[in-house]
Amino acid sequence: MHHVVSATTNPAKIQAILQAFDEIFGEGSCHIESVAVESGVPEQPFGSEETRAGARNRVANARLARPNADFWVAIEAGIDDDSTFSWVVIESASQRGEARSATLPLPDVILEQVRAGEALGPVMSQYTGIDQIGRKEGAIGVFTGGRLTRSSVYHQAVVLALSPFHNAIYR
C-alpha cells in the first residue's frame, strides 16, 4: 500500500487526491495522511510562478514532516490575471510531476476584493453565505452551478501530475 502525504487538511483537496490515486493505482491501494504545512507564499498567491512555488514549498515541507512516505502531494490555488486556478505538485523519492488545473474567470466584484488583499475563500463566503466555501465546492461550484466543484477540477490536475509515475516513457 502506498503511503501518500497530502500537504493540506482541506477536504476538497484530499478528496481529489484520494480519487486520483485510487483511479491510477487501484482502489484501496493508497493510504492518505494529511499534514498542515506552510506554503511560504501569501495566503492568496498571485500569478502562476508564485502559486507553483507555494505548491513546491508545501511538498518540500511535507517531506520534512513525513520523510518515510511514498508520495507527497500539494495543491496550491492562486489568482492569475482575472481567473482562479491551481498547481498540483507530486513527488516520490525519485520523481516529480506537476500540472496546472483548469482556470475559472472571476467576476469583477470578486476580483476587486481579492486584489485589495482579501483571499478568495473568505470573499466567496461573504458573497454566498456559505461558511468555509474553500473547503467545500469553492468558487468553481458556485459559478458553474454545481456542474464542477473545486475537488473535481483538482482531481483532473492530480491525474495529470501523476502521469510520470505510471508511464515508463517518463523515466
Swiss-Prot record:
One of its GO terms (molecular function) is ITPase activity. The keyword Protein biosynthesis does not apply. GO terms for biological process: nucleotide metabolic process; thiamine metabolic process. It comes from the Bacteria. Mg(2+) binds at residue 38. Binds 1 divalent metal cation per subunit; can use either Mg(2+) or Mn(2+). Keywords: Hydrolase, Magnesium, Manganese, Metal-binding, Nucleotide metabolism, Nucleotide-binding. Its cofactor is Mg(2+); Mn(2+). NCBIfam families: inosine/xanthosine triphosphatase (TIGR00258), PRK05074.1 (NF003459). Belongs to the YjjX NTPase family. This is Inosine/xanthosine triphosphatase. It comes from Klebsiella pneumoniae subsp. pneumoniae (strain ATCC 700721 / MGH 78578).
